[in-house]
Design a protein with these regions (language model features):
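Conserved N-terminal beta1-alpha1 strand-loop-helix module at the mouth
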Residues: 1-84, 101, 150, 161-162, ...
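Glycine-rich beta-to-alpha transition loops that act as phosphate-gripper elements at the mouths
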Residues: 17-21, 66-72, 88-92, 108-113, ...
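Short acidic active-site motifs
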Residues: 51, 73-74, 94-95, 114-115, ...
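Short hydrophobic/aromatic-enriched beta-strand-loop microsegments
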Residues: 62-66, 84-90, 105-109, 125-131, ...
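Glycine-rich phosphate-binding active-site loops on the catalytic face of alpha/beta enzymes
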Residues: 85, 89-95, 128-138, 172-194
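Anionic-ligand binding region
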Residues: 113-127, 137-147
Length: 209
């Protein structure tokens, strides 16, 4: 799988933090019921890898990826947990080359023109623009489109259901990352119906963007 394949499954990739393994499978099923198939599980909790394994085994219709990859070891652990892709908050040549060597498709993070050049030089032309809002948002992506007409972006960070259409309307944006689909209070309360509703609203952005 190529990371660019992810865009064919919907306009938003949820950026997910899971605190309890028991929540992983019902959360994935709730998102899938709302039309969201691609899931980014961040490596920000001790149970993240176990959650990836659980979802991959119990909900094979999903495409599980690992977010917050910051080292070669993280990339290998994600692959071993059954992840189909990885996402990093930034880019280093070591991570980029390691992911290619082990066969883990990577969506590397960038925030500046220099970082875009570094990732592009290593063969990555679909990049995570992070943190999207803090790094300049829509105006910055418009500015990057000039010198980097061959690069596509997945803006992530500070995006909401209300602002996502502004990003998705850009010609160099194919998909957005968003944490708003899985608010922590809804997960803690196991309010799967609310999460399904949020997923449906995000999926509908494909039609209105």
């Amino acid at each position: 799988m190529n990371t660019l394949d992810l865009v064919s499954h919907g306009p938003v990739i949820p950026v997910i933090v899971i605190q309890r393994v028991a929540d992983a499978v019902p959360l994935a099923r709730a998102l899938l019921a709302g039309g969201v198939k691609v899931l980014e599980i961040t490596l920000r909790t001790p149970v993240a890898l176990d959650c990836m394994r659980a979802i991959s085994a119990a909900v094979p219709e999903t495409l599980v990826g690992a977010g917050t990859i910051r080292s070669v070891a993280d990339a290998q652990a994600a692959l071993d947990a059954g992840c189909r892709f990885g996402v990093s908050p930034g880019y280093t040549r070591d991570i980029g080359r390691a992911c290619r060597d082990i066969g883990l498709p990577l969506l590397p993070g960038v925030a500046t023109a220099s970082e875009v050049m570094a990732a592009s030089a290593d063969g990555y032309d679909f990049l995570k623009f992070f943190p999207a809002t803090a790094a300049g948002g829509v105006p910055m992506l418009k500015a990057l489109a000039g010198p980097f007409a061959d690069v596509l972006f997945c803006p992530t960070g500070g995006i909401t259901l209300q602002t996502a259409p502004q990003f998705l309307s850009l010609p160099n944006v194919r998909v957005c990352g968003g944490s708003w689909l899985t608010p922590q209070d809804a997960v803690d309360a196991q309010d799967w119906a609310r999460i399904t509703a949020l997923a449906r609203a995000a999926s509908a952005l494909r039609q209105v963007a």
